Structures are given as structure tokens and as C-alpha cells.
Amino acid sequence: MLTLIPLPAFEDNYIWVWHDAKYAVAVDPGDPAVLSTYLDSRGLALAAVLVTHHHRDHTGGNTWLRQRYNCAIYAPDNPRIPAVSHVVRGGDSVAVPELGLALAVLATPGHTLDHVSYVGNGHLFCGDTLFGCGCGKLFEGDAAMMSASLDALAALPPTTRVCCAHEYTLSNIDFAKTIDGANPALLERERIDRAARAQNRPTLPSTLALERTTNPFLRFHDADMRAFAVGELGSPDPGPATVFGAIRAAKDRWDG
């Protein structure tokens, strides 16, 4: 029986830890102190680290953790990611035999060019590509690239549990309501997620089914999101990537 825990780190990061009674795998452990405190208090050995992209809040623990636990570190091919033992690319798989896990690697560029996601045992570890009711900013990629990555994630089974790297859900819901405020599924999600945060509980993991019905960044094929893009751009027939780009631009303006 595996336990999945989102460990809060920094202001709003989550370090995802999947473990049994002896071994653990961690995703994007930017703060090694947070992770090691959890592991050591339970007598867990760190078998592997999975890194989604090169940003420091996702990679800052790599060097210390590899020295401390002699763990494998899987990451995309980028010299800015330290202490990597195994480079991964889309189409690869990662085995963690200590936990009986096999995870597929998906290339999900957009937030960064090197971004990958990991999928296995009904769980998606998507870093900063997909958030609760949102998606990552386009720091390196473009709208076509990110929309293709999100389409790939949306094609996973609806029961897939979505394990994002940041607790941004309530802010993302606030934005989503400005363009999709009549969506009853979104309003029900807001009720549930606000109650969770009021009790200091995470809003994650969500499910792909929930994201498909409430997240505007997975709904850019839908008629109401296309209508929003037409109003924003004045284009009579925008394609899916253009619709996504209009939603992303609106979110960037809303963020200020």
C-alpha cells in the first residue's frame, strides 16, 4: 500500500512524496530540509527523485539529497539541473523497483522547453504544466506548444489524479470565474476547494475529470471558450491554439 503526500514547501510549492513503509520517491524536491525531515521521521529511504523542469524551486534539493540518500535522480536534459543520474525524454519510462512503480515520461513543453511529466498507477505528476483550474506561464514555449502539451494530458483517463507542483487553485478559480462564471461545475469546485483551504487542507490532487469540466486551460476546444477568444481577438474562427493563447493572455493581464 503506497501513501501519497504533498509536502508544502516555500510559499506555495508541493513536494510530492510517494512511499511505503521503507522506500520513497519524491517529485520536484526544491527544499531538501522539508523532504528529509519527513523521510527521516519515518525511517524512509529515498529511492528516487523525479524532476519535471529546471526551475530552482523544483531542483534545489538535488545535490544534497543525492549525497545524503544516494538516490537516483531522473530529470530532463538540461545543464541547469544539478546532480542528475538519469536523463529522461518523452517516451521514456522510469522504474522504481523498490516501490513496484513504472512511470511513463511525457514531453510537456510550454512553461519551459525542457518540461516533462510523469504518469503511473493512475497518477499524473505535471509540475508547472497543469495546475488546479489553471496552467503554467509560458516562460520559454509558446501557445501552440503548451496547448499541445495540455491536450496530451487531457487524453489521459478521467480518473487520473492530478498532482501539481503549486497550490494556486483558489486564485485560478477566481480568474476562471471572470470568463466562465456561469459554469456550475466551476462554482461547485470553488465551494469545495475554499472549504479545504479554510481548514489548511490541499486542493490537490484533483482529477482530470474535474479539470476537464472546470479548468479553462483544458477547455480551449469548447464553444464557450472559443466565443471568449472571438470576443478578445475579433477573429471569427480561431483555432484551438489561438483560443488557448487568448485565455493565457487574459490570465497574464489578470495576474498583473
UniProtKB/Swiss-Prot annotation:
Catalytic activity: an S-(2-hydroxyacyl)glutathione + H2O = a 2-hydroxy carboxylate + glutathione + H(+)
Necessary cofactors: Zn(2+)
Keyword Transferase: no
Residues holding Zn(2+) 1: H53, H55, H111, D128
Keywords: Hydrolase, Metal-binding, Zinc
Gene Ontology terms describing biological process: methylglyoxal catabolic process to D-lactate via S-lactoyl-glutathione
Cofactor binding summary note: Binds 2 Zn(2+) ions per subunit.
Xref: CDD domains: hydroxyacylglutathione_hydrolase_MBL-fold
Residues engaged in binding Zn(2+) 2: D57, H58, D128, H166
Involved pathway(s): Secondary metabolite metabolism; methylglyoxal degradation; (R)-lactate from methylglyoxal: step 2/2
EC number: 3.1.2.6
GO molecular function terms listed in the Swiss-Prot or TrEMBL record: hydroxyacylglutathione hydrolase activity; metal ion binding
Family in the record: Belongs to the metallo-beta-lactamase superfamily. Glyoxalase II family.
NCBIfam families: GSH_gloB
PANTHER family, alphabetized: HYDROXYACYLGLUTATHIONE HYDROLASE, HYDROXYACYLGLUTATHIONE HYDROLASE GLOB
HAMAP family to which the protein is assigned, alphabetical: Glyoxalase_2 (MF_01374)
The protein's role, per its UniProt record: Thiolesterase that catalyzes the hydrolysis of S-D-lactoyl-glutathione to form glutathione and D-lactic acid.
Subunit record text: Monomer.
UniProt-recorded name of the protein: Hydroxyacylglutathione hydrolase
Gene from which this protein is expressed: gloB
